Amino acid sequence: MKKKAIGHAGWLWTGLASIVAFIYFFPVLFIILTAFRSRMDTLATPPKWIFTPTFENFYHIFFRAMANSTEYVSTGFHVYFFNSIYISGMSVLLALLIGTLAAYGFSRHPLRGNDTYLFIILTTRMLPPIIVIVPIFLIFRITGLAGTYTGIILMYTAFNLPFSIWMMKSFFDELNTEIEDASRMDGASERSVFFGICIPQVKAGLAATSVFALILTWNEFLFSLLLTNKLTRTMPPAMARTIGGEINVDYGLLAA
């Protein structure tokens, strides 16, 4: 009797878990189905669950029709996709390199007023981008960095640096320093201690920091919109221009 009750309880929990999983997965399923709907089916009310699948949304991501013509030209979407990969990858790499070195210094060789310096670094990340975009835009225009890969990579590196420093410092603080002290007593240099002992122990921190920084950079919109041009534009502003305006939004393209 007890085994039977446990079996019923197991089926009950399995059913509840399945319902919760379906509720969470349903928006993803709806987006996938919308990507294969035509424009008319997308705007249908109530939504059509039985429809003829089409790949036109995926095609129009890469090609658009010319005005008063049946010809199609490239949207340059593949360029924007490459830009996002290149800019995000380089900025995350630089932020991780500089941030890891700075975090190690703050953790192992604190200065007088160490907490104050860390707080100042953190406050630079607290400022909303819209507050600093005007002076940054003027600086970029004067220095010729506007519309260049170098400019936007440096911007995103500075954007991710405070986060990288704080996150990596927390990982360094959790390490046991006895092995490091013993290595120094045996004549190991600071460089050997850093690369040979500390870095292997914070691989998980490096991975977590790089993933978070990559997500922030990949999804950033404002800096990419105002500090890039057609050749260096990344995915978020490119998607906004491709999908539609404030009134006319192509939800099929958005889902694709």
Model-derived segments and spans:
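A structural signal for multi-pass alpha-helical bundles of membrane permease subunits
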Residues: K2-A256
